Amino acid sequence: MSYSGIFAILLPYMAFAFLGGATNRLGITRGRPEKLILKFYINVLVPVLIVNYVVGNDALKDIGNVIAAPLVGFYGIVIGYIVSLATVKYFGIREKASAASFAFTVGIYNYGFISIPLTEHILGKSAVGLLLVHNIGIDTAYWSVGIGMLTGFSIKNMKALLKNPPLIAIFASLAVNFAIGGDVIPEWARKIMHPVVVAAIPIGIFVSGATLAENASALIKKGGWLVSFGAVLLRMFVIPALMVLTVMILPVSHELKMITAVQASMPAGMLSIVIVKYFGGDVETAAQTIFTTTIAGMFTIPLWIAFFMRVLS
């Protein structure tokens, strides 16, 4: 697919993020409404979306895919954390909390809101199911290694991971696939789920934009052009290249390689700022990282996806 074709797919979803930001700054979604939307998204919309894409997905009856996908996802996050921690001092960040916040936000990319619709448009519906299983590894790295960087490693973080509704939905859907096989969801249930699935991604992107706008003051207070430069350099260039170079030589399915190409191209995850804020990290550094990589991503995402897919093909 060409640069212009991928950009055309990406643009409406980015518009939802900016719309979410605008409603926050106008006071429409600020505070409690934003938190309610976020809770509804994580606990209801995402689990329904997962069941829709995973149950009955033939690609997920292959045990090789089910094992390899989370491992590749885990690696993609951990390599980002390692590269970020190893280079953070070159971007003017000296304090421990700021370094951890920088590495956390640079290392975790936007692995759901933007990558899911792009994957479906480019690779098809079955690839989305594999991507969601791939995200098990991302969630594991996020809540273990990532939160460990911010707070110290603990069993409590792993317990929080296991109580995560999207993760429960993935494991339950995979269990249905292997135990029963075939698409066990009746047509009438699919029709009920359809509007929920259609709404899930735009709502997720919308609330992400609102959350980022909520912390816009942190972005304004601290210039930090060197931090922004480092975030874009690592998240949008160095880490994607490492991820795709690695997956090129791994004995995994072509579909998983293509999914990695899409995921590697993503900017820093927007909701990471909520986690950094919750655990007492450096919100200013996190805001800069997310904002600058998201803006850069509007132009680099189509470029990288088109290039990576040509290389992997």
Which residue stretches match the model-derived regions?
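Alpha-helical transmembrane segments of multi-pass small-molecule/ion transporters
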Residues: 1-313
